[in-house]
């Protein structure tokens, strides 16, 4: 059976409940912490390193929850939410490839913020290039990523690391 190469919001929410990739595969967060509305493309051999890529989007509207509290009279999307979306996508990629377990962010090499997401923006686009995939006792993905708002790059991150664990009780 061929794997899907794009996903809707409904499918991503189903992933958060264990109903898309399978019950033992990494899950996405749901509700407010799911920072992705759709995956436009996902593949195992594309991207800058030929090891996979993901392009995903988040629709921006003035009524998103974080604009009411970050900050009063100066609404801006928290940078950490964009970074978390990148980690979410690396974990999703590993589950899409077949990894089983629970995903955990393990770190990032460097993050740069050169812009902001304001309530009048329309769309955030995440672009991830998978650099390395480890599928042994340790399952880990490493990626470089950018985040654009309305076509302008405003975040970049190198060496985003996500691990997949069968037991997180001692993590």
From Swiss-Prot:
Pfam families: FabA
Metabolic or biological pathway: Lipid metabolism; fatty acid biosynthesis
Active site: 70
Cellular component annotations (GO), alphabetically ordered: cytoplasm
A GO molecular-function descriptor: trans-2-decenoyl-acyl-carrier-protein isomerase activity
Subcellular location, principal: cytoplasm
Any GO BP: unsaturated fatty acid biosynthetic process
Keywords: Cytoplasm, Fatty acid biosynthesis, Fatty acid metabolism, Isomerase, Lipid biosynthesis, Lipid metabolism, Lyase
Keyword Lipid metabolism: yes
Annotated EC: 4.2.1.59, 5.3.3.14
Subcellular localization(s) per the UniProt record: Cytoplasm
InterPro entries given in the database record: FabA, FabA_FabZ, HotDog_dom_sf
Enzymatic reactions: a (3R)-hydroxyacyl-[ACP] = a (2E)-enoyl-[ACP] + H2O; (3R)-hydroxydecanoyl-[ACP] = (2E)-decenoyl-[ACP] + H2O; (2E)-decenoyl-[ACP] = (3Z)-decenoyl-[ACP]
Stored NCBIfam families: fabA, PRK05174.1
Similarity-based family: Belongs to the thioester dehydratase family. FabA subfamily.
Subunit structure: Homodimer.
Function: Necessary for the introduction of cis unsaturation into fatty acids. Catalyzes the dehydration of (3R)-3-hydroxydecanoyl-ACP to E-(2)-decenoyl-ACP and then its isomerization to Z-(3)-decenoyl-ACP. Can catalyze the dehydratase reaction for beta-hydroxyacyl-ACPs with saturated chain lengths up to 16:0, being most active on intermediate chain length.
Designated name of the protein: 3-hydroxydecanoyl-[acyl-carrier-protein] dehydratase
Organism in which the protein naturally occurs: Shewanella frigidimarina (strain NCIMB 400)
Gene this protein is translated from: fabA
